[in-house]
Amino acid sequence: MTTTQKHDLFTPEPHYVPGYAGFFPQLRYQVGNTYGRTTGQLLTDPSVQKSPCSVLSPMSKPKFIEDFSQSKPPRVPCQDLTEPYIPHYTSLKPSKNFEILGQLPPLEVDAQEPPGVENIPRQILLPAGFTPDTPHPPCPPGRKGDSRDLGHPVYGEEAWKSATPVCEAPRQHQLYHCQRDEYPPPARRQQETLDVGSFQRLPQLDHPNLIQRKAISGYAGFIPRFTWVMGLNYRDGVMQAMDEFDKSQFLFRNPHCDLGEKLPGTHWPSNHIYSSQGLIPFYMGFIPAMQDNYALTFGNSTRRAYWKEWAKRNHTL
């Protein structure tokens, strides 16, 4: 049989996995060959010295010879696959001959059923109002008792209510499982009214700027007035920067002016964390009258561009 030949477009074997960024000896950046083709040439070049311990997978599949001389132990199937129960079910598990008191006739010890009858499901007539899915406490162990003491096993409760005598059942001891409700039915819960306003309330914090003072691990976003200082950790630096920013925002919203003087033109009342003069950090949209300025942050550049546009409009008016 002739093996199928690979096209020249595919990387020759052997080669390293694409995306491998480890050490590869005698590999230089070359123009015209891919990474896989270059590594393939180096691996197949006889003049290049190679280590006897190869890191590549073997080219040919190894032949495994299984030893059948020794006898193997019988295979034990998984118990979960043979047990007819639901996984993680921890409630009552009745036995094969489980019977409810007063519902099934007594078992005949001597009678033998013909083959194939045990696979036929039995139709049991249940009384009105009987719910088989009603939760019950764990069933107590079966006990032996006389059928006269427990009632007629065939007619059940009807034998107690009717005045006419019924045919007597054979005196034979039989295991009965008795169940009773030991817990009162759960009371109906009152319909709770949903408070819609609770979704709009902010949490009450001990400190007004407690959220700002917590430095999130791995956060690499913009922090106002934060500078890298030698010997100061990240958390302390963020707390100092936010304190300075809060002071500057307070002085900006409440400028100092003597009695009778007009408020300065830089007073812009705002409830946001950033002033109305500057744009949002990392905004990459169009800003009129803004060019690349040296030694100016993005916020100061946008503020300067805003004031230039504001002065230009006032001058034209």
From Swiss-Prot:
This protein's GO CC annotations: axonemal A tubule inner sheath; ciliary basal body; nucleus; sperm flagellum
Family annotation (InterPro entries): CIMIP2A, CMI2A-C-like_dom
GO BP term, example: flagellated sperm motility
Compartmental location: Cytoplasm, Cytoskeleton, Flagellum axoneme
Record's keyword terms, sorted: Cell projection, Cilium, Cytoplasm, Cytoskeleton, Flagellum
Domain of life: Eukaryota
Region described as Disordered: 131-153
UniProt xrefs under PANTHER family: PROTEIN FAM166A
General function of this protein: Microtubule inner protein (MIP) part of the dynein-decorated doublet microtubules (DMTs) in flagellum axoneme. Binds to the intra-tubulin interfaces.
Record family assignment: Belongs to the CIMIP2 family.
Subunit annotation: Microtubule inner protein component of sperm flagellar doublet microtubules.
Identification of the protein by name: Ciliary microtubule inner protein 2A
Origin species: Homo sapiens (Human)
Source organism phylogeny: Eukaryota, Metazoa, Chordata, Craniata, Vertebrata
